[in-house]
C-alpha cells in the first residue's frame, strides 16, 4: 500500500471498539444501518452501538461521515459527528449527499448537483442494494472519483458472492445464495427484494437477536420456509 493509497475496509463492531484504544477513526466513515448483532458478545444494544461509534469517535473537522438517512438510529448520530456529515436515501431527497429522483441517482455535494441516470438498469434487487450503491457512490466521490465514472461502474456491477448472488436457473426456478445475511434484518432485506413469494432455506448460530420481525417477513414474503442449524427451533 502506497502512502497516498486509498484503502476500503469493512470493520466489525469488535474492530471498531479497538479503534477507540488507538484513538483513530477513518477519514471517510460510512454507516449503512444499525440493527441488533453480536449481542451474545456485547450483552445489549447500548454496548453494541457504543462499539459502532468508534468509527466516528476520533474524526476531525477535516473528515467525513456518510450516514443512511433511512435509518432512524443513524439520523440521531448527526449531533455526535465531528466530521462533515453527508446523507444518502433511497426514499427522499437529502440536503447534501446522494438520493433518488425518478430513474436517476442524484449526487448533491459542495453546491453541485448531478443526475446519474439508469437506476432501472441496476442489476442488484432490493431497496437495500440501492442504499448500498448510494453510500458507495458518495464515498467514491469524496475519495476523488468522477461522477460519470461512478455511473458507469454502477451499471456494470453484478454483485458479490454470497450476497443475493444469482446461482442458476433450473426448470424456470431461480436460485439465489444470500448466506452472508447473518442477522434477521439482513435476511428480511433479502427476501423483501423479490416480487414473488420465495422458498427460503434459513438458519445458523444464535447471536442473541430476536426473530419476531423475521418470522413476520417470512409470512409475508415466503411460500415455504426450511429451517436448519442451531436456531431452527427458535
Regions found by a protein language model. Give the residues of each.
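Beta-strand->loop->alpha-helix junctions that form or flank phosphate-binding loops
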Residues: 82-100, 151-155, 165, 227-228
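Short, polar loop motifs at secondary-structure junctions
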Residues: 69-73, 90-93, 230-233
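Short, intrinsically disordered, charge-balanced linker/junction segments flanking boundaries
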Residues: 1, 5, 231-234
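Flexible active-site lid/hinge loop adjacent to a nucleotide/diphosphate
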Residues: 2-88, 99-101, 106, 117-124
Amino acid at each position: 500500500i502506497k502512502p497516498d493509497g486509498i484503502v476500503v475496509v469493512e470493520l466489525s463492531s469488535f474492530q471498531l471498539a479497538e479503534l477507540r484504544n488507538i484513538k483513530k477513526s477513518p477519514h471517510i466513515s460510512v454507516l449503512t444501518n444499525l440493527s441488533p448483532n453480536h449481542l451474545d458478545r456485547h450483552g445489549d444494544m447500548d454496548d453494541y452501538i457504543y462499539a459502532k461509534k468508534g468509527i466516528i469517535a476520533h474524526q476531525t473537522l477535516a473528515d467525513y461521515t456518510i450516514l443512511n438517512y433511512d435509518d432512524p438510529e443513524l439520523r440521531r448520530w448527526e449531533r455526535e459527528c465531528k466530521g462533515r456529515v453527508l446523507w444518502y436515501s433511497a426514499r427522499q431527497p437529502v440536503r447534501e449527499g446522494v438520493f433518488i429522483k425518478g430513474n436517476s441517482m442524484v449526487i448533491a455535494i459542495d453546491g453541485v448537483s448531478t443526475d446519474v441516470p439508469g437506476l432501472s438498469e441496476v442489476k442488484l434487487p432490493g431497496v437495500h442494494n440501492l442504499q448500498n450503491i448510494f453510500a458507495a457512490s458518495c464515498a467514491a466521490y469524496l475519495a476523488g472519483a468522477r461522477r460519470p465514472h461512478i455511473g458507469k461502474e454502477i451499471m456494470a456491477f453484478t454483485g458479490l458472492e454470497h450476497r443475493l448472488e444469482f446461482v442458476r436457473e433450473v426448470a424456470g426456478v431461480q436460485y439465489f445464495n444470500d448466506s452472508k445475511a447473518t442477522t434477521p434484518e439482513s435476511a428480511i432485506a433479502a427476501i423483501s427484494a423479490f416480487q414473488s413469494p420465495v422458498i427460503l432455506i434459513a438458519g445458523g448460530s444464535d447471536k442473541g437477536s430476536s426473530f419476531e420481525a423475521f418470522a413476520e417477513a417470512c409470512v409475508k414474503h415466503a411460500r415455504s420456509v426450511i429451517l436448519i442449524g442451531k436456531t431452527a427451533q427458535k
